[in-house]
UniProtKB/Swiss-Prot annotation:
Keywords: Cytoplasm, Hydrolase, Nuclease, Ribosome biogenesis. The keyword Transferase does not apply. It is found in: Cytoplasm. GO terms for biological process: rRNA 5'-end processing. This is Putative pre-16S rRNA nuclease. It comes from Chlorobium luteolum (strain DSM 273 / BCRC 81028 / 2530) (Pelodictyon luteolum). The keyword Translocase does not apply. It holds the Pfam family RuvX.
């Protein structure tokens, strides 16, 4: 049986991008950090040099009625750029509905002070963790 590679989760934003990654067995997700849009490709290349990455899941904004919004088109362009930059990497979109809200609740429940929770990027990487965890739970087999 071929060993699994890691999966990266990406919470894309125009100002910051949250990144999370699974363990090698794809059992759980951990935050990697937050990056400016221009620095994400460099970070992904760095990760892929040290680890086998099988898949990237990108949070895609979906309205409650299932339709997209203005940010959906931005994420679609990002996904195409990601596929062009990493042609061997499988990329899938996942519904990111309420991932930031859920991440905010998780950070609050963790006992972190409000000041720490408000640090730039902490919420973004936690949201990437949430969407990656959802993906893992939905695809356990």
């Amino acid at each position: 049986m071929k060993p699994k590679g890691r999966i990266v989760g990406i919470d894309y934003g125009t100002k910051r991008i949250g990144l999370a990654m699974t363990d090698p067995l794809q059992l759980f997700a951990s935050p990697v950090g937050t990056f400016e849009p221009g620095g994400l490709h460099h970070e992904l290349r760095r990760i892929m040099q040290g680890d086998t990455v099988d898949l990237a899941v990108v949070g895609s904004p979906v309205c409650d009625d299932g339709s997209g919004n203005a940010m959906t088109a931005v994420v679609d362009r990002f996904v195409e750029e990601l596929r062009a930059a990493f042609p061997d990497l499988r990329v899938e979109r996942v519904d990111e509905s309420h991932s930031s809200r859920e991440a905010s609740r998780i950070l609050a429940a963790s006992g972190k002070s409000r000041k720490v929770r408000r640090e730039k990027g902490r919420l973004d990487s936690a949201a990437a963790c949430v969407l990656l965890t959802r993906f893992l739970e939905e695809n356990r087999g």
